């Protein structure tokens, strides 16, 4: 027994060093993945001393944290953990978006996106008020500039009504200034429930609640693979999956991945198909000067062109008083490529080998080139903004922050616009669920998405 204690102390085999199971472990074969993992875990860290879990969620963005919170509310006795590769939560998509609380206007009636957005809108505002999270219902104007856009605007209104978007209304040319004094257009759609919030703050509130209920959060934990503990096969009381990192590992019964920009890579680790692949698109914002902030008090959006996948540049007030203009949409050369000079060789090679990206680029070649030109010569983007507020000039703007959108793409170059869940192959795959695509507006819908995923976890894993 003394020999085993020395072995356990040296290799930190997580959650298998109790007196009750020392002898049992000594009489069992230890698999190669376990030995590798044990060797990696030879230096003590907080993750190694935590023991085994019922459920580990990979990814500390808003969908992962909201789902973790929802699962512990439903099942307070579950032992759960969130692992995040960065040194803080909400470091990527959650912390680099426009901060808009969407009302659910754009989405196909009856679709999951439409239902979850409208439900998430109401749940979000209730949560903000309950926890005194700074937010503001500034509303949104979707402004038509010509007759062709008016027809599309009317179609959007019908879609919003079918989606049960609250208090949606059409306003004529003379009434636009009632909602935004300096805004011009032929007709507009007014959505008073659209708002603004800092979604990174909301994400951290979810994580704090999760921790208060007994959940654990481990930062700087980059998952490098999943392996199976062979001696636990067929035994429900053990934790057969090892969630591996570079120098540590955590045993768990089940795994949910909500890895955003890296979701496809984690899925492949458990034998899932390569498709859909994640292609990173960078959205770059401009900042309106302090002296011109009075020009914009509400969200101002163009009528979206159905030929193109993104909503177009818009005016967005922020809870800190800033006005963001944009974003554009340009292909990034790294999955975490927030600047032009951010280039990741591995990411570029993967994109170069992916036929779906070539098909997408061919389909949107001209608008894609225009977006890249506007990215380099940003004063050109101001022309689009002047259609709505003519008083804005290129002297009033400067470069602002950027975000990277994890766009799921199939092999035919089609943008995947719905939720994608996957498991994998073999005994490991049966215990792992991958959220491979949680499409925009995932932040607004996060609490509703969490309920949906929790239902699926309960069904698939019989929790």
Show where each model-derived region lies.
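Beta1/beta-strand and adjacent pyrophosphate-binding region of the FAD-binding site
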Residues: 48-63, 81
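Flavin-dependent oxidoreductases
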Residues: 66, 226-345
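Glycine-rich FAD pyrophosphate-binding loop
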Residues: 72-95
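Dinucleotide-binding Rossmann-like beta1-alpha1 core, especially the glycine-rich loop
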Residues: 99-179, 185, 312-313, 322, ...
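Short beta-strand to alpha-helix junction loop
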Residues: 108-119, 143-152, 190-211, 218, ...
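Helical element adjacent to the flavin cofactor pocket in flavoenzyme catalytic cores
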Residues: 189-254, 258, 262-265, 447-458
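Flavin-binding catalytic cores
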Residues: 273-275, 291-293, 318-402
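C-terminal catalytic lobe of FAD-dependent flavoproteins
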Residues: 360-463
């Amino acid at each position: 027994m003394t020999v085993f204690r020395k072995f356990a102390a040296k290799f930190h085999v997580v959650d298998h060093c109790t007196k009750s199971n020392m002898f049992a472990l000594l009489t069992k074969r230890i698999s190669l993945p376990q030995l590798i993992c044990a060797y990696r875990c030879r230096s003590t860290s907080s993750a190694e001393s935590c023991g085994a879990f019922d459920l580990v969620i990979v990814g500390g963005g808003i969908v992962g944290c909201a789902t973790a919170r929802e699962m512990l509310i439903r099942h307070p006795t579950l032992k759960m953990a969130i692992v995040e590769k960065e040194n803080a939560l909400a470091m990527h998509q959650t912390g680099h978006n426009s901060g808009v609380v969407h009302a659910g206007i754009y989405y196909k009636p009856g679709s999951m996106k439409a239902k979850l957005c409208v439900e998430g809108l109401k749940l979000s505002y209730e949560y903000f008020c309950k926890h005194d999270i700074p937010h503001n219902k500034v509303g949104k104007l979707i402004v038509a500039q010509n007759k062709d856009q008016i027809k599309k605007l009317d179609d959007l209104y019908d879609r919003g009504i079918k989606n049960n978007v609250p208090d949606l209304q059409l306003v004529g040319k003379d009434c636009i200034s009632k909602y935004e004094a300096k805004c011009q257009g032929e007709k507009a759609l007014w959505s008073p429930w659209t708002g603004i919030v800092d979604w990174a703050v909301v994400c951290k509130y979810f994580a704090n609640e999760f921790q208060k209920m007994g959940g654990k959060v481990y930062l700087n934990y980059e998952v490098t693979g999943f392996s199976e503990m062979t001696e636990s096969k067929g035994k429900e009381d053990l934790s057969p999956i090892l969630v591996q990192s570079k120098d540590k590992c955590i045993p768990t019964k089940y795994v949910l991945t909500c890895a955003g920009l890296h979701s496809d890579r984690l899925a492949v680790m458990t034998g899932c198909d390569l498709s859909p692949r994640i292609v990173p698109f960078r959205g770059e914002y401009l900042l309106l000067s302090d002296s011109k902030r009075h020009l914009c008090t509400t969200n101002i959006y163009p009528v979206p062109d159905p030929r193109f996948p993104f909503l177009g540049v818009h005016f967005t007030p922020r809870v800190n008083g800033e006005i963001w203009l944009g974003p554009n949409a340009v292909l990034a050369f790294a999955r975490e490529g927030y600047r032009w000079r951010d280039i990741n060789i591995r990411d570029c090679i993967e994109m170069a080998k992916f036929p779906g990206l070539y098909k997408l680029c061919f389909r949107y070649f001209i608008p894609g080139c225009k977006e890249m030109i506007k990215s380099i010569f940003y004063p050109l983007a101001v022309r689009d903004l002047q259609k709505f507020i003519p008083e804005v000039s290129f002297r009033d703007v400067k470069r602002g922050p950027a975000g990277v959108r994890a766009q799921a793409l199939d092999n035919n170059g089609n943008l995947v616009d719905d939720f994608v869940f996957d498991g994998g192959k073999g005994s490991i795959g049966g215990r792992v669920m991958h959220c491979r695509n949680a499409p925009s507006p995932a932040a607004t819908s996060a609490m509703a998405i969490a309920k949906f995923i929790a239902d699926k976890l309960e069904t698939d894993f019989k929790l």
